[in-house]
Amino acid sequence: MTKQFAVIGNPIEQSRSPELHHAFAEKTGVDLNYQKRLAPLDGFESSMRSFFAKGGSGMNVTVPFKEQAFALCDVLTERAQIAKAVNTLWMENGKLHGDNTDGQGLVAAIQALEWNLENTTILILGAGGATRGVIYPLVQAGAKKIVIANRTLARAEQLVDDLKTAVPQAQLQAISLNDLEGDFDIVINATSASLSGDALQLPEKLKFKYAYEMAYGKPSSFLDQAKQRNVPYAEGFGMLVGQAIEAFSIWNNVRPQLKDFL
């Protein structure tokens, strides 16, 4: 019997999840159908519950419903609890389970690039939900210190305070985007600057070996500056594929290989 999956969001037209999951299915022999599902901004819960009531096997959640999905889950993975957002849902024994695979997607993408994560010092630009979701997996993968830089320093400080309890083994620090300096192994752009076209200027006194842009398929002043410095760089398509593979493997107990889809 064909398993039914979906990705839910608003907007949803831009999602590449169906093509990825159908490609994974073809590679692994899983019989599935995966659809885009547009939910009204005030209609996420009813749309999601209707999908599972009709026999849906699993659902991905995208903007702007990840925090709402988190709040509705009966059972959460540890990384979802820390992220306070859920992008992967499934029903098990009548209970709604939730996970957040974004951080693992980022880790898998970085590892596929053969950038070392062990004992690294990482700078993340931005202190929103995208950053919160990746801290724990980065630490699990070996990152030694993570510095979070944000335009509003108080927001970065709040995030660090929240995460210090959840991820006590990590060295976490908050700074202002105006105070970017020092040496880092990897800089990750998790700000919406690339999406909105706001140019984020990286000062000369900020040094880094690698640059990762979470967004993909759009012009990025962040990556332009990495190119000018001749620093190895990548955009977020690998992260997208990585998080999709993680969700696929949770639902289907088979894991496609990331390298086959990059």
UniProtKB/Swiss-Prot annotation:
Gene Ontology molecular functions: NADP binding; shikimate 3-dehydrogenase (NADP+) activity
Keywords, in A-Z order: Amino-acid biosynthesis, Aromatic amino acid biosynthesis, NADP, Oxidoreductase
EC code(s) of this entry: 1.1.1.25
Reactions this protein catalyses: shikimate + NADP(+) = 3-dehydroshikimate + NADPH + H(+)
EC primary class: oxidoreductase
GO cellular component terms attached to this protein's record: cytosol
Coiled-coil stretches noted in the UniProt entry, renumbered to this chain: none
Protein name: Shikimate dehydrogenase (NADP(+))
